[in-house]
Amino acid sequence: MSKHSSDLNNLISHIALYDSESAYKQFFKYLFPVLYRFSYCLLKSKELSEEVASDVMITLWKNRKNLPELENVKVYALVIARNLSLNVLNKHSRHELVSIDDIEIEVALDSLNPEQLLINGELKKRLEQATQSLPDKCKMVFKLIKEDGLSYKETASLLNISVKTVDAHLVTALKKLALVLHMEVNLLWLCI
């Protein structure tokens, strides 16, 4: 078991046993962004995604006594988020939900000169654009595995698809992102 899993399990235990609000706040800081990003992949709306993520966190707090019994609380929370998001989509099926979201990607900025910062900023922007241009399933699989750290099996279970389909979506996403980034890097070097 990783230290991260152990820390998460300790937080869950404190929430369940002691109704610890401080442990819940740490748990919230960890899980809310994951739930938000996942919901956003389905809903394409900042407001609705925040609402779904908040509803999941409230549900987890209300059911806190049962959390230690769950095998994987993160996957459980994502399943709730999926179901709530699908309910929202069903309610809004006649309306197209569109919003622009800024997915933050951490870039190591230590000892970079202004030119490198500019190049990294451009690459980050292009990567975000390339990620947004992926087909919905590819984008969702990419984010769940690469950004949220879920396994192929957990992702397959969450999306109700096979592990091989998860692998195929991830390969497609990585190929498209690599192609876009390769072209962008070549273009940036031509400009320098």
Question: Model-flagged regions — what are they?
Answer:
Residues 65, 79-98:
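Arg/Lys-rich amphipathic alpha helix in sigma70-family domain 2
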Residues 1-33:
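N-terminal module of bacterial RNA polymerase sigma factors
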Residues 51-58, 71-83:
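Structural recognition of an alpha-helix C-terminal capping motif at a helix-to-coil junction
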Residues 2-4, 158, 174-192:
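C-terminal edge and immediately downstream basic/flexible tail or linker adjoining helix-turn-helix-like DNA-binding
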Residues 5-8, 95-117:
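Internal acidic/polar
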Residues 129-132, 136, 140, 144, ...:
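Helix-turn-helix DNA-binding module
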Residues 28-46, 63, 131:
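Amphipathic, Lys/Arg- and hydrophobic-enriched alpha-helical face
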Residues 17, 57-72, 91-92:
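Sigma70-family region 2
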